[in-house]
Regions:
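Acidic, glycine-enriched loop/beta-strand segments at the rims
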Residues: 310
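Active-site bordering "gate/hinge" segments
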Residues: 1-305, 313-316, 323-324
Length: 325
C-alpha cells in the first residue's frame, strides 16, 4: 500500500497558493515548503516500557523569495487565509531589508535566480503494516516478545533492549512552475544485548531499517541469532595487540569508513585548512576494483529516501562516491 497524503496539506494548499501569488507580485521568484509529520518511538528494557514522540516530527512552513539580487527565507508555524497579507508584509518589512543592516564595509553578493523547471507530481513510499492500525499495545507486545526470545537464548545474557521508531512525513513544495508532494514512511528497529566477561560488560548491537511500516518487527526477529552469537564471541574474545593491520571489512563497515573518511573528509572547510587527507586520494584507488559505492536518495529505499528536490531529475540518478575502486 502507498502512504496516503496529509489532510492538513490538502487543507492548506489553496491558501499557500494564494500566498505564492501574493509574493510573486513583489518578487521575481518565490517558493513555499510545507512539512507535516508524525511518529513514535517504542523502547523496552529491564527499566521498563517507554513510548515517546519521534524526536524528528515537525510541522511548519518556509518561504523563500528573490529580489533580483539575493534571497531571504521566512519560517512560520501557522497560516490561515486571513493571514496571507500579514505574512507577505512580514517578509517585505523584516526579512528582505536585511542588507540595510550590514556594516558599511560589507557588500551584498549577487546571486542568479534559481532555475524553475516545471515539475508536478505526488509520490508515496510503500508499506505493509500501518503503525496506527497495529496500535501501541500490539507494537509493545511484539517488541517484548522479541526481547524475551533473545533473553531465553543464553542464560549468561543479562540484558536485552529492543526499540522501534517510525516517522510518517509529508512535504509540499510550491513555486511558479513546481507543485510537488511527497509522502514517506520510514521505520527503524534496534536490538541491543549485554553479556558479562569477568568484571566487564560486553555489548552487541544490531538493527534494521527502511521505507515501510511495522512489518519491520518481523525483520527484528531475524536479528536475534546473530546478536546472540556476537555476544558469545565477545564474552570469549581477547583484546587485539596494538599495531598496524590490514583489515578486510564487511560492506556495512566499509560503508561507514568511507562515509567518515571521504564524506566528512572532503568537506570544504577541511580542504581550506589543509586537514583533509582525502585531498591526496581524489582520483586514486581507495578500494578493490569490485567496489562501487552509490549515494543519493534514489540509491536505496531507506530512511533517507525522498522524492522532492529543487531539481527533481537529479534525485533519480544515484551518484557514485566510489566507482570501481
Amino acid at each position: 500500500m502507498k502512504v496516503t497524503s496529509s489532510r492538513l496539506i490538502e487543507q492548506k494548499k489553496p491558501i499557500l497558493k494564494q500566498l505564492l501569488d501574493r509574493l510573486l507580485q513583489t518578487y521575481s521568484y518565490a517558493s513555499i515548503l510545507m512539512t507535516d509529520s508524525k511518529g513514535k518511538q517504542y523502547t523496552i528494557s529491564k527499566q521498563g516500557i517507554s513510548i515517546t514522540e519521534n524526536m524528528f516530527v515537525e510541522l511548519g512552513y518556509v518561504v523563500k523569495v528573490y529580489d533580483g539580487e539575493s534571497y531571504g527565507e521566512y519560517a512560520f508555524s501557522h497560516i490561515d487565509e486571513n493571514e496571507i497579507d500579514s505574512v507577505a508584509e512580514e517578509i517585505k518589512n523584516h526579512v528582505m531589508p536585511w542588507a540595510k543592516k550590514l556594516p558599511d564595509d560589507m557588500k551584498v553578493k549577487q546571486y542568479p535566480e534559481i532555475p524553475d523547471e516545471a515539475y508536478h507530481f505526488e509520490k508515496s513510499t510503500d508499506y505493509e503494516v500501518l503503525p496506527e492500525e497495529l496500535g501501541d499495545e500490539e507494537i509493545v507486545k511484539r517488541l517484548g516478545a522479541v526481547r524475551e526470545k533473545a533473553m531465553a537464548q543464553d542464560e549468561k545474557i543479562v540484558e536485552i533492549k529492543t526499540a522501534c521508531v517510525y516517522q510518517i512525513y509529508h512535504k509540499l513544495f510550491l513555486s511558479p512552475n513546481k507543485d510537488m508532494t511527497q509522502n514517506v514512511m520510514w521505520t527503524n528497529g534496534m536490538i541491543m544485548g549485554l553479556i558479562p566477561k569477568g568484571e566487564e560488560m560486553k555489548m552487541a548491537f544490531d538493527s534494521c531499517s527502511g521505507c515501510g511500516g511495522m512489518e519491520i518487527l518481523d525483520d527484528m526477529e531475524t536479528k536475534i541469532p546473530p546478536l546472540v552469537q556476537k555476544l558469545n564471541d565477545l564474552a570469549t574474545s581477547e583484546p587485539i595487540t596494538p599495531g598496524e593491520y590490514d583489515c578486510i571489512c564487511a560492506p556495512d563497515v566499509t560503508g561507514m569508513i568511507v562515509h567518515e573518511a571521504f564524506g566528512h573528509g572532503v568537506e570544504m572547510d577541511m580542504f581550506v585548512k589543509k586537514r583533509a587527507l582525502a585531498e591526496k586520494y581524489i582520483g586514486e584507488y581507495v578500494a578493490s576494483p569490485l567496489v562501487t559505492m552509490h549515494d543519493g536518495a534514489a540509491a536505496a529505499s531507506e530512511t533517507a529516501t525522498f522524492f522532492l528536490m529543487m531539481r527533481e531529475h537529479l534525485r533519480r540518478i544515484p551518484s557514485s562516491l566510489i566507482k570501481e575502486s
